[in-house]
Amino acid sequence: MGLSGKNVVFVGGLGFIGYEACKQIMTKNVASFFVFDVLENAENIKALQAINPKTKVYYTKFDITNKASIKSAFADVIAKVQYIDVLVNGAGILTDPNVELTMNINLIGLINTTLEAIPLMDKNKKGRGGLIVNIASVLGLEPAPPAAIYCASKFGVMGFSRSISDPYYYNLTGIAVATFCPGLTETPLKNNIATKYTFEYSKVIGDKLNNTKTQKPEACGAHLAQVLDTAENGGIYISNQGTLSKVTPTVYWQPTFN
């Protein structure tokens, strides 16, 4: 759809991959750019604004686990610019011992954010259609024995995104939904990784996974910005070791109608 002239909302835009993507987005002549994050980083917001002074950058303190915070943040966007054209759901954590928090941020929060945005973007209601990109992971496509809870949350993102990208919904609302799956990337998610595994037994296989080849957040962020510019409804995109590719999931079952 292209980003030029669009109003963009980025949830979790001050994280490593998110921030690198935000820097790329600011070169695309977007109309306005809203960054939702739980922690404010005034220096990063100022740096984003400096990339393109013509694009107004807004920061909103945002708690993705709180429905009131979600509703308030989106209402503020509509009050300021009337329309949302692009939503990026990029908030995420890796901490398997805290099952509830992992699910609340990685999956439930993402679902609630999406469901809040859809009526505002729906061309038959208050919006003019647009694009939602949900950030999952390659561990939403393949199992991750050392991080089973994180993996489950990302599989949930994948299932949710694929379901709401059904052409039936797209044709009604004009909202395309795509999924972006980073491979292993050098971010703070890897910090103190031994404390984040599912079981104490997970350390051996977890440390082995943690020592595999990674990519820089700059490369992953650039890929995400590219997807935002070119994504197709239902598209699933992997950013891994500096390469961006589109994947077609295997179909294991289809309903047989009477």
Curated annotation (Swiss-Prot):
Sorted keywords for this record are: NAD, Oxidoreductase
What does the record give as the reaction this protein catalyses?
Answer: a primary alcohol + NAD(+) = an aldehyde + NADH + H(+); a secondary alcohol + NAD(+) = a ketone + NADH + H(+)
Q: Where does NAD(+) bind?
A: 9-33
* CC annotations in GO: cytoplasm
Which residues of this UniProt protein bind substrate? Answer: S137
Q: Would you say which domain of life the source belongs to?
A: Eukaryota
Q: Where is the active site?
A: Y150 (proton acceptor)
Question: Which EC class is the enzyme in?
Answer: oxidoreductase
Q: Which InterPro entries match?
A: ADH_Ceratitis-type, NAD(P)-bd_dom_sf, Sc_DH/Rdtase_CS, SDR_fam
The Enzyme Commission number assigned here is 1.1.1.1
Give a GO molecular function annotation for the protein: alcohol dehydrogenase (NAD+) activity
Complexes and interactors: Homodimer.
Similarity-based family: Belongs to the short-chain dehydrogenases/reductases (SDR) family.
The molecule here is called: Alcohol dehydrogenase
- In which organism is this protein found? Bactrocera oleae (Olive fruit fly)
Gene name of the encoded protein = ADH
